[in-house]
UniProtKB/Swiss-Prot annotation:
Sequence segments annotated as region (Disordered): 1357-1377
Coiled coil segments of this chain: none
Signal peptide: none
One GO CC term on file: rhoptry
PANTHER family, alphabetized: FER-1-LIKE, SPERM VESICLE FUSION PROTEIN FER-1
Name of the protein described by the UniProt record: Ferlin 2
Lineage of source species: Eukaryota, Sar, Alveolata, Apicomplexa, Conoidasida
Listed InterPro entries: C2_dom (IPR000008), C2_domain_sf (IPR035892), C2F_Ferlin (IPR037725), Ferlin (IPR037721)
UniProt xrefs under Pfam families: C2 (PF00168)
């Protein structure tokens, strides 16, 4: 289990096309994004068939994963159809491996990915997404780094058919796609550990290419034969490579337990198949897993220390030639496979001694696969000595000690104490482990050596494993009959939570293997105790950190075989020079035949002396196996060379807390007086060091043991910060002195003086910024005559310590330490020198140390007689040897591709170096200045970058494409501009202070250093800068004189946007706003907060007058506006970025870009603290100019893209040839529905609008004359899709879908927004329905529409109504008669009566009755009255 890290993953779901829906009907799609236990759901889009647009973004910036988990991490996009009363329907999914994205140059991918369905092999559409994945220290990609998609530029706006999104095309594979079937076969699992419920219920799952397959489930067993094959259809290219195999234990009424997980590389599987082989599973014990997770969460790295079983797997990839051969993912039965060839094997072990273990008794266990055996329990020498002397505690006292031990155990205290535990022949003999193992060494079990302790008085409840070691079976030596081996010391690894046990224990033992079934085990080898002298040459230490917050008072202790010696204590220094040879008289077991000793682990521990006692800082464990003896006649004496060793400290002994320069030497005690010690004093050259200090910036001082609370400082919470006022900075400059053994006078004190003694009118300013940070001008130069070792391995260091007034621990602010190796004038090869002084982990990792030959200039180039040499060191750890072999194999494999072509030698020599780098590129690094980047030319440490003076340009179509031009007509840099300015003479170097195990940046110091030898100019330093910076008067005139800068300047800050902001809680949407700090002035733009967005667009220009040096520190803060529960403000501080304006003003490169009005745009990271994690990125640039000439410098009109509003009017005239026969009907009740998907739509009209119904159309023709309006479409928009769909109307139930057409309207909107001229287009558009399309049916009808695009201002002056409502104009729409009559409505309902044949007789009858009525009224009625 590797240490956990914080990763950032973000994505944008753009759109989906050509979705395959059930029965071809429109659905309500959404996208569900899953990643590392997180889930995000997009908005549901309604009634979509083929094209769906989302444009939704989300970011997770707090994914806490180990290295192994990151290797297998995926982000999965599932397109689902939402259902109201049952489970959503899966339309398609795609997975992307995050590790592959993180390895890309821009850490992101933007692509249309094919959607797959687990039940078949067809492509179910495509999903266009943008995904980025960043490891710790990597900033999210800037918008300029996105992979721009090529789009055609349509200039014809009259033909609406060109805006149709063609979703009727057949979804095809990418060009160059290859088809595969991947077969992963799980044959058998064995030796699964028992759980709390007893036997296991195991099953196996396999995940790849968006599919997850599961085997059958076994019941109540720890070994089971599956013989099942997982088949996956794979089409390359594929955005994932890892095939995940997981072994689970089924649980009833709770989550299944994951036993083990493994991965197979698909790319390797394509080159060669994996024949069935055993994979051994290793993990952690159930009782230790909680502690292991805790340690990993705090940055610790753990090694699996328990055998959890094994699985027999086979895999292969089969290439297919036809797409018809591709079959869906499925689990099928596999033919049983014979077990790989096996051989008998026995593991033999004898334990001689255990050293450095706490507890009363110890026992050593050998664990190999399913077999394990232990030694007997042995009591330590201290307990035995107490028993023999009669001072052992009586029964009552022992009971009291036991009670105290139980209390310590319950409190969780770590047991302390060390003891030696010798084993005799009987106690140390481990029972033979007789096994049957695979013949292939890679499939054989590892051997786990565990150390168990017991002892209630020591705080151990029961048998407790405190340390272990895992060894490969192939590294175990073979057993030779009647020839016992000499024992060796095996270093152990502490188990959680015993990492803080002083040194890790070690075991002196013999472990062998025998492949003979019948053998006679001989007695273990007899070894005798012989006296030796261990000489530990402790030269120096560097970069030491004290958890107390003050400067450490360090000393080094070297311990071996129960003997220890210490150096003297050095006070208040982080880079002490000890120059001390510690002599340890030790007794070690020696083989009487070979006369070679068994060297016990050598523990080098760094402590600091405090007033209350001794505090642990760091430790390194060295394993040494060389013996220095007398010289033979004619043999030249051996020379020695020290090496820098890493020290590990912290709560779990996993943090790098400094380095120590060390050399070890072992000789026989009888030869100690004959063999002299190596001379430690190196050959030195006297040099002159010039230290020019400009001043200190942004200083903070807190209580000694209190951390600096940056967030509370930004919030102005003075009580929580507990800051102390800084009245007068004091600088202590010291340089390592090897000639005087660290006791020389290579140091100087610089005090802040407000007025110069020689000129009281000259004032050095001391001021405070708005964030309570102290700043001061020093302007002092000190010249020091120092001794510099000729050999750079000693790494002389310059240390700057800053105090407040007094040089006492409670006034300590921080320190800065730098190596002088890049400044040494006679060092010729800086690359090799820096590699030589880089620390190694410890001697266990040092299989082959590299010599420093060729580093020195002139007569020192090849002479090692005047300096030191090196004793080769070799590790005893089998794991380290294996790592070295693997590294060597990798080097040879890579070197095969780097072949030399002699034919190109003449041409390449003209402009290439032997390393392959262009000469002009390397020469550009020779810019004067000592803080230069060294070019590493080996294949593992290549760090070449393009300097600021180089311009890269593109040719061809991409260069002419307007999308590649900078949006704001200026260059840009991918990070901060300071990293690209190489002429800054006084850069800001961080002052650091260790508090409570963490490091705070407490300020910055600005200085210049020059190192000369024999008064010759230093080739690594700018000679022109050294001339004026070496004098206080010239430096003051250059930086504070009348011509240095105008009395009043003006700053312009252009902030475009922020990217991927994170407030620390996924449930909170930020409302970002900007806050500007300049000196003691602060301006907030809280009133302009952008609501509910992680990617706000500010488009803000901020101007302010600047007076140097008071306003030289500029800080841009980003906050999130929130209201508290009680009604007050409860804003959240997101992060800030700081710029030193003084550096930029005095940079000639920056002034040149400013004069051309081409200041680069920056993507500056936002952090809550200088050493914290990224909280986002801000896109901005800064201009600085003379106040009087500010009017001559044009101000860039930084405005957000004009929020032009456009209105869309859709007029549906009618339709023809609607294919209603596909619905099984003889007529159609036609209806047209429009749906707008647009990110910028802000209108009040509904997104979905529909026409009235044209009833009872037997020809498929329909007339509507219907207007739909979408007002207030705010520009710009990323996409705008209008869906026009035809339906067969149903008054009850869902209306059947006939066909649709989708239009991309973005370019029409952009044209109207830029020209403010309306666009009116007419077209007859073809309707499509992919689900019902066949060879006989290719057309589903046509719809006649008119689209009007009008600026909102014009549309407001000429409003229109929806449908045919008033105002009805432009054009006037009439109500059609067709399809609206009663007979049409009744005919649609099936109630239509055809009365046309009876119409003639109805009219005749009516005439007759009318005539009779007239006759009666005219003649009969008057006569009756008369």
């Amino acid at each position: 289990m590797g240490k956990t890290k914080i990763y950032s993953v973000g994505f944008t779901v753009h759109e989906a096309q050509t979705l395959v829906t059930e029965k071809g009907q429109p659905v309500d799609p959404l996208v569900v994004v899953r990643c590392c236990g997180r889930e995000y759901r997009t908005e549901i889009k309604y009634a979509k068939s083929n094209v769906v647009s989302w444009d939704e973004s989300h970011t997770w910036t707090d994914l806490c994963l180990t290295d192994e988990e990151w290797e297998t991490a995926y982000i999965t996009f599932e397109v689902q159809a939402a259902n109201a009363f049952w489970r959503n329907t899966l339309l398609g999914l795609v997975s992307v491996q995050l590790r592959l994205i993180q390895l890309r140059k821009t850490h992101q991918i933007r692509k249309a990915l094919p959607l797959q369905h687990p039940d078949d092999t067809d492509v179910h559409g495509s999903l266009r997404v943008t995904v980025f994945a960043c490891a710790p220290g990597e900033a999210p990609p800037s918008p300029g780094e996105e992979e721009v998609l090529e789009e055609e530029d349509h200039n014809d706006y009259d033909d609406l058919r060109k805006a149709v999104i063609d979703t009727n095309q057949v979804v095809e594979r990418e060009a160059g796609s290859r088809l595969y079937h991947v077969y992963v076969t799980a044959y058998r699992v064995e030796d699964l550990p028992r759980s709390s419920k007893g036997a296991r219920d195991p099953f196996v799952t396999c995940e790849f290419a968006g599919c997850k397959l599961k085997s059958t489930q076994a019941r109540g067993c720890c070994s089971h034969t599956f013989n099942e094959c997982f088949r996956f259809p794979v089409v390359t290219p594929l955005p994932e490579d890892a095939i995940l195999i997981k072994i689970w234990d089924w649980n009833f009424m709770k989550a299944d337990e994951l036993i083990a997980v493994g991965r197979i590389s698909f790319s390797e599987l394509r080159t060669r198949q994996m024949v069935p082989r055993w994979f051994n599973l290793y993990g952690f014990d159930d009782e230790e897993v909680a502690q292991a997770t805790k340690v990993a969460g705090q940055g610790g790295r753990l090694v699996a220390n328990c055998y959890l079983g094994r699985i027999l797997l086979g895999a292969r990839a089969e290439r297919l030639t036809k797409e018809d051969d591709l079959m869906p993912a499925h689990t099928v039965a596999a033919r049983p496979y014979e077990t790989p060839p096996v051989i008998p094997l026995a593991v033999l072990a004898d334990v001689y001694e255990v050293q450095g273990a706490p507890g009363e008794k110890v026992s050593v266990e050998i664990w190999c696969g399913p077999a394990r055996a232990r030694t007997k329990w042995v009591t330590g020498l201290e307990t035995k000595a107490a028993q023999r002397a009669g001072v052992a505690p009586q029964a009552f006292n022992r009971a009291m000690e036991g009670a105290l031990g139980v209390a310590s155990y319950l409190r969780g205290d770590i047991p302390e104490g060390e003891d030696r535990f010798p084993f005799d022949n009987t106690e140390g003999r481990v029972e033979d482990l007789r096994l049957v193992v695979p013949e292939d060494t890679k499939q054989q079990w590892d051997i786990i050596i565990s150390l168990y302790v017991r002892g209630t008085t020591k705080g151990f409840m029961g048998d407790t494993r405190i340390a272990f070691q895992r060894l490969k079976m192939s590294k175990i030596p073979g057993h030779v009959h009647n020839n016992p081996r000499a024992p060796i010391w095996v270093p152990l690894i502490s188990t959680p939570p015993f990492e803080s046990v002083k040194p890790a224990p070690a075991i002196l033992m013999v472990i062998e293997k025998s492949k003979v079934e019948a053998f006679a085990r001989s007695k273990r080898k007899h070894v005798t105790a012989v006296g030796y002298q261990l000489r530990a040459y402790v030269y120096a230490a560097r970069n030491l950190l004290s958890p107390s917050g003050a400067l450490p008072n360090p000393f080094v202790q070297v311990a071996c075989a129960g003997t220890s010696r210490e150096t003297e204590v050095f006070e208040q220094t982080s880079s002490p020079v000890f120059m001390d040879c510690l002599l340890l008289d030790i007794t070690m077991m020696t083989d009487p035949v070979s006369r070679l000793p068994t060297v016990a682990p050598i523990v080098v521990t760094l402590f600091e002396q405090r007033s209350w006692g001794i505090q642990f800082l760091g430790r390194a464990t060295c394993h040494y196996d060389r013996l220095r003896g007398r010289l033979k006649p004619g043999e030249s004496p051996t020379v020695a060379e020290p090496r820098w060793i890493k020290l590990r400290g912290g709560k779990y002994a996993n943090r790098h807390l400094g380095d120590v320069l060390l050399l070890l030497e072992l000789i026989r005690k009888r030869d100690a007086e004959i063999i002299p010690a190596f001379p430690m004093r190196p050959v030195v050259n006297m040099c002159n060091l010039t230290f020019s200090c400009l001043g200190v910036r942004s200083l903070y001082m807190t209580q000694r043991a209190k951390r600096l609370d940056y967030v509370s400082i930004r919030k102005g919470q003075d009580k929580k910060t507990e800051l102390r006022r800084i009245r007068g900075p004091l600088l202590r400059i010291s340089v390592s002195s090897y000639a005087s053994a660290g006791r020389g006078n290579n140091e100087a004190i610089l005090r802040y003086e407000r007025n110069l003694p020689e000129d009281p009118t000259t004032v050095n300013k001391l001021w405070t910024t708005v964030t309570k940070a102290a700043n001061a001008d020093i302007f002092k130069v000190v010249n020091m005559e120092i001794d510099v070792p000729v050999d750079p391995i000693y790494d002389p260091r310059l240390v700057v310590q800053v105090y407040d007034r007094k040089q006492k621990p409670k006034y300590f602010i921080g320190e800065y330490s730098m190596s002088l190796v890049p400044l040494i004038p006679w060092v010729l090869d800086q690359q090799s020198a820096i590699e030589a002084v880089s620390p190694v982990n410890d001697f266990t990792d040092t299989v082959d140390l590299k010599h420093l030959g060729g580093l020195l200039r002139g007569f020192h180039g090849n002479s090692k007689n005047r300096g030191t040499g090196q004793i080769g060191l070799e590790a005893l750890s089998a794991a380290d040897r294996e790592t070295a072999d693997a590294h060597k194999e990798k080097t040879l494999a890579q070197s095969r591709f780097a072949t030399y072509d002699p034919d190109n030698k003449t041409f390449s020599d003209s402009w290439l170096l032997p390393s392959g780098l262009p000469k002009i590129l390397v020469s550009s690094y020779a810019v004067p200045g000592f803080r230069c980047d060294v070019i590493y030319t080996n294949m593992f440490t290549l760090n070449v970058y393009i300097p600021a003076k180089f311009v890269l340009f593109a040719e061809g179509k991409r260069a002419a494409d307007k999308k590649t031009k900078e949006q704001y007509a200026r260059p840009s840099v991918d990070s901060t501009l300071e990293q690209f300015l190489d002429d800054v003479i006084f850069p800001s170097d961080s002052l650091k202070k260790s508090v409570m195990g963490d490091i705070d940046v407490t300020g910055f110091v600005k200085f210049f250093v020059n190192l000369t030898h024999h008064e010759e100019p230093n080739p690594h330093v700018d000679s022109s800068a050294a001339e004026w910076a070496s004098s206080e008067d010239r430096m003051r005139r250059h930086l504070r004189g009348e011509d240095a800068y105008p009395k009043l300047l003006k700053i312009r800050v252009y902030v475009i946007r922020a990217i991927s902001l994170y407030v620390g809680d996924d449930r909170i949407l930020p409302n970002p706003y900007l806050l500007f700090n300049l000196g003691d002035k602060s301006d907030t733009l809280r009133a302009e907060a952008k609501p509910n967005t992680h990617n706000p667009e500010f488009f803000t220009v901020w101007e302010k007058d600047v007076m140097f040096p008071d306003d030289s520190q500029f800080e841009l803060q980003v906050w999130s506006a929130h209201e508290g529960t009680s009604g007050g403000l409860d804003d959240i501080f997101i992060g800030s970025t700081c710029i030193d304006l003084e550096e930029r003003w005095f940079s000639k490169e920056w002034q040149k870009s400013m004069s051309k009005n081409q200041v680069p745009m920056e993507y500056r990271p936002l952090k809550q603290m200088p050493s914290g994690s990224f909280k986002g990125t801000v896109e901005m640039w800064v201009e600085l100019m003379d106040f009087q000439k500010a009017g001559e410098v044009p101000k860039f009109d930084l405005q957000s893209p004009a929020a032009t509003e456009v209105e869309i009017r859709v007029i549906v005239w009618g339709a023809r040839n609607l294919n209603f026969k596909a619905l099984g009907k003889d007529f159609v009740d036609a209806m047209i529905r429009c749906n707008l998907d647009c990110t910028g739509y802000r209108g009040s009209q509904p997104i979905a609008q529909q026409t009235d119904v044209h009833y009872y159309s037997k020809t498929g023709a329909a007339i509507f004359n219907w207007r739909m309006v979408y007002s207030r479409v705010v520009m710009p928009v990323s996409t705008c899709v209008l869906q026009i769909a035809a339906y067969d109307n149903r008054n009850m139930g869902e209306s059947p879908f006939i066909g649709e057409v989708n239009l991309e309207l973005r370019r029409y909107l952009e044209r109207v927004a830029s020209t403010l001229n309306s666009i009116d287009v007419d077209a007859e558009l073809k309707l499509i329905n992919r689900s019902r399309e066949s060879a006989d049916v290719s057309s589903f009808g046509f719809v006649q529409v008119s689209l009007q695009f009008i600026s909102q201002s014009e549309a407001t002056s000429k409003p229109v109504g929806l449908g045919r409502e008033p105002p009805n104009r432009d054009p006037r729409l009439t109500t059609p008669q067709e399809g609206r009559k009663w007979e049409d409505v009744l005919g649609s309902a099936g109630l239509r009566v055809d009365y046309r044949p009876l119409w003639y007789w109805v009219r005749v009858a009516a005439v007759v009755f009318l005539s009779i009525w007239i006759f009666v009224v005219a003649f009969l009625y008057p006569s009756l009255l008369g």
